[in-house]
């Protein structure tokens, strides 16, 4: 409710301290209330429990919730030296042994955990099922078979984990692992954990896979709808009539449910434009109240800012951590070093990445500009947070093309330079990063010029210099770069074109327009302009990785699908009389055709991911943590996933979700397409395509088969997210819905693990950006 949102703003001083979460709206409340249909106790004693790793295990008689005693674990949170991966110092595991049992009768584990850890707001643990049957669990090199926990200090927590899809035909143990990440505030390096009342249970499992809607639920956008928008919701079945009630309970609209694929029934109440709070009713099912109004997405925008404030690095964030990572350094090839604390922690860990920071700043600038008149306080707060990120981007550059591009950080350092936990990351001269940051700095100039001309001048100098450095290096070899830092010809030139046009808009110098035009010609050469006559769906307008059309460009984790469309849109807006303007518009219209056709192929109006060709992939761009021998991608797995897509011809398939391996979760790829659709809508003044973009936002915010909001703290039934280093953060949008094995349908189990439930600035800023573009 907007009144509740106002109170949250006041209590957090417009999110200058973290926003409190509402556990009653979280899915956990529903899970814990489920009736238990069958159960079996798993006693914890010295005969069946083993300790692995550092620490001491003992039986505790007094501190117990069952009254029968608990297992006590005294565990270090430190280690003598950091792990080479920059992750946990050590892992302590309590294994509850089992004699190779078939546990398929049960689909949930329940236990209680208490942690004594005054200095840690969130104690990260992993609960795993160890299966040695037909399928090994946890799955080597992947993230299946393990459920992560975040346990606060000082209170018994009831933990449940439903695992109906986890292989469990020969289970040899259930483990609880505690990771040593140090403490976020100075404190003794150790915690005490109590584990009690472990049991296996059978419950009615949540819907976790497929396009069918969760039983008893209505799929709708929890944030609400703008007055002029198409307003639709879904039920799995219906008698034919639905009702829309206002806040007084009066029926203001009724309509007929329209049959859809998968047995869905669509409810369309688009004629309702009066602002207010409403509920939907169909066949005895009732939605929660939702907003129709121009301000429907404003609470979500505020919450994304709350997430970013809570993720600040090098800053005392109340309730989460004190100033941090002051001993993390970026090292220039000539040996110079500079501290890189600041900016935002990138995801569930404490990693930083320059390009994600840059995109986040860009989204904040867009929000600040979009809401200057209607929501001035929101605009000012977005501008304030953007400056925090800008400062970091400009402070961590060397002024010669090299800058801090990012580094993996998975622990709280001691903030003292010269000790064993120091992290020294190599600076890099990456043209993609420099292009993106140059464009962001250029966009910031106008927003800061009046209130702080010196800061605006700093932005201007960095924009021009970094663009020049990127130009000089854009054709250098990427062979020594990591998988996540390799870019195709399409990606590099799209980002270069955007950057050139941001500088052209900021400075008015025709050199930048000329550069943008040149880059755009390469982008047009990468676009499919003709339909393959053998395709079952007449698709064109998509892009290849390069001018030779060797492979169609697709994304599985980070996504820049919007980039070529944004480049064309900027050129068409800023140089409408240019001789290439008709060609830019044609490219926009080709992609519009592609979006319009594909938007009608999947339930809920979901945009599919892209076109894949059998036997045509490049594993060098696939990020994989740990030894590649464990869970590494293979051509056999690639082809199996491709064949599960929508068949276009003997070699090409349209996948709803990306082909993916270890890193799964696809909100980023979806929002890349949504941003592209928003750019199309702006450039072509196309309301139909704008609605396609909005539908992708609605999918994320509740109009999906699981009837959950993916933004933590927005709407209801949001799942706990993978955030090992912090409490659950309101406003986080995770990597999110994934796929199961080689299938091509949404998969969203209760299991909480990387990467799909991991909080991420890349996805959260994309939602902020989309809201700004409304």
Task: List where the protein language model places each region.
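Short carbohydrate-recognition loop motifs
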Residues: 59-89
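Extracellular carbohydrate-recognition regions
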Residues: 1-62, 308, 700
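Glycan-recognition and catalytic cores of secretory/periplasmic carbohydrate-active enzymes
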Residues: 3-17, 23-24, 205-207, 213-214, ...
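Extracellular beta-strand elements of beta-rich domains used
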Residues: 111, 161, 174, 193-200, ...
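Aromatic sugar-binding surface patches on proteins
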Residues: 154-160, 259-272
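Extracellular ligand-binding interfaces
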Residues: 77, 81-168
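Extracellular carbohydrate recognition
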Residues: 182-201, 760-761
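Contiguous beta-strand segments within globular domains
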Residues: 103-110, 213-237
């Amino acid at each position: 409710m907007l009144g509740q949102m106002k109170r949250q703003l006041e209590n957090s001083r417009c999110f200058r301290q973290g926003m409190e979460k509402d556990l009653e709206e979280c899915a956990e409340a529903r899970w814990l209330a489920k009736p238990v249909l069958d159960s079996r106790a798993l006693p914890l004693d010295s005969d069946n429990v083993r300790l692995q790793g550092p620490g001491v295990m003992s039986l505790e008689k007094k501190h117990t919730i069952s009254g029968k005693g608990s297992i006590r674990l005294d565990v270090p949170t430190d280690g003598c030296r950091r792990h080479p991966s920059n992750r946990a110092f050590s892992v302590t595991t309590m294994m509850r042994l089992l004699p190779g049992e078939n546990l398929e009768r049960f689909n949930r584990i329940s236990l209680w955990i208490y942690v004594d850890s005054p200095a840690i707001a969130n104690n990260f643990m992993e609960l795993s099922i160890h299966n040695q049957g037909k399928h090994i669990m946890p799955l080597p090199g992947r993230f299946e078979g393990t459920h992560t926990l975040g346990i606060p200090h000082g209170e018994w927590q009831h933990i449940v984990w439903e695992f109906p899809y986890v292989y469990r035909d020969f289970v040899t143990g259930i483990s609880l692992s505690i990771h040593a990440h140090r403490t976020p505030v100075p404190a003794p390096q150790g915690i005490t954990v109590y584990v009690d009342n472990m049991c296996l249970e059978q419950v009615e499992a949540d819907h976790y896979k497929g396009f069918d809607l969760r039983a008893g639920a209505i799929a709708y956008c929890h944030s609400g709808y703008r007055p002029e928008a198409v307003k639709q919701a879904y039920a799995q079945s219906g008698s034919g009539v639905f009702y829309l009630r206002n806040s007084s309970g009066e029926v203001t609209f009724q309509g007929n449910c329209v049959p859809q694929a998968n047995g869905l029934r669509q409810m369309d109440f688009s004629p309702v434009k009066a602002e207010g709070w409403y509920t939907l009713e169909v066949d005895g099912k009732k939605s929660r109240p939702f907003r129709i109004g121009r301000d429907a997405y404003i609470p979500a925008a505020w919450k994304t800012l709350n997430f970013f404030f809570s993720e600040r690095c090098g800053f005392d964030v109340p309730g989460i951590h004190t100033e941090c990572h002051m001993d993390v350094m970026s090292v220039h090839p000539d040996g110079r070093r500079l501290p890189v604390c600041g900016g935002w922690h990138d995801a569930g860990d404490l990693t930083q990445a320059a390009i994600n920071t840059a995109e986040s700043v860009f989204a904040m600038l867009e929000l600040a500009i979009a809401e200057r008149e209607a929501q001035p306080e929101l605009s000012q707060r977005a501008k304030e947070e953007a400056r925090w990120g800008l400062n970091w981007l400009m402070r961590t550059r060397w002024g010669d093309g090299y800058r801090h591009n990012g580094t993996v950080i998975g622990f709280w350092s001691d903030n003292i330079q010269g000790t064993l936990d120091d992290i020294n990351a190599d600076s890099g001269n990456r043209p993609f990063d420099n292009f993106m940051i140059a464009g962001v700095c250029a966009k910031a100039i106008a927003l800061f010029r009046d209130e702080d001309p010196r800061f605006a001048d700093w932005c201007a100098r960095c924009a021009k210099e970094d663009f020049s450095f990127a130009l000089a290096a854009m054709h250098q070899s990427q062979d020594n770069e990591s998988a996540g830092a390799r870019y195709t010809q399409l990606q590099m030139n799209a980002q270069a074109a955007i950057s050139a046009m941001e500088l052209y808009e900021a400075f008015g110098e025709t050199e930048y327009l000329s550069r943008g035009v040149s880059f755009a010609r390469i982008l047009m050469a990468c676009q499919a302009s003709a339909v393959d006559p053998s395709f079952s769906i007449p698709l064109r307008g998509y892009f290849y990785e390069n001018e030779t059309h060797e492979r169609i460009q697709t994304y599985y984790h980070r996504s820049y699908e919007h980039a070529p469309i944004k480049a064309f849109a900027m050129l068409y807006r800023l140089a409408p009389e240019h001789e290439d303007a008709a060609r830019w518009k044609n490219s926009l219209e080709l992609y519009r055709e592609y979006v319009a056709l594909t938007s009608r192929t999947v339930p809920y109006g979901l945009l599919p991911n892209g076109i894949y060709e059998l036997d045509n992939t490049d594993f060098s761009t696939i990020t994989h943590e740990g030894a590649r021998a464990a869970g590494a991608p293979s051509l056999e797995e690639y082809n199996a996933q491709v064949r599960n897509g929508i068949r276009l011809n003997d070699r090409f398939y349209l996948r709803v979700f990306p082909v993916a391996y270890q890193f799964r979760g696809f909100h980023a790829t979806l929002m890349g397409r949504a941003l592209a659709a928003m750019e199309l809508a702006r450039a072509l003044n196309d309301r139909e395509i704008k609605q396609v973009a909005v539908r992708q936002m609605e999918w994320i915010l509740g109009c999906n088969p699981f009837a959950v909001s993916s933004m933590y703290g927005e709407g209801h039934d949001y799942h706990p997210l993978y955030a090992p280093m912090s409490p659950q953060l309101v406003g986080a949008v995770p990597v999110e819905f994934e796929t199961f094995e080689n299938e091509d349908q949404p998969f969203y189990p209760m299991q909480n693990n990387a990467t799909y439930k991991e909080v991420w600035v890349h996805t959260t800023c994309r939602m902020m950006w989309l809201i700004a573009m409304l």
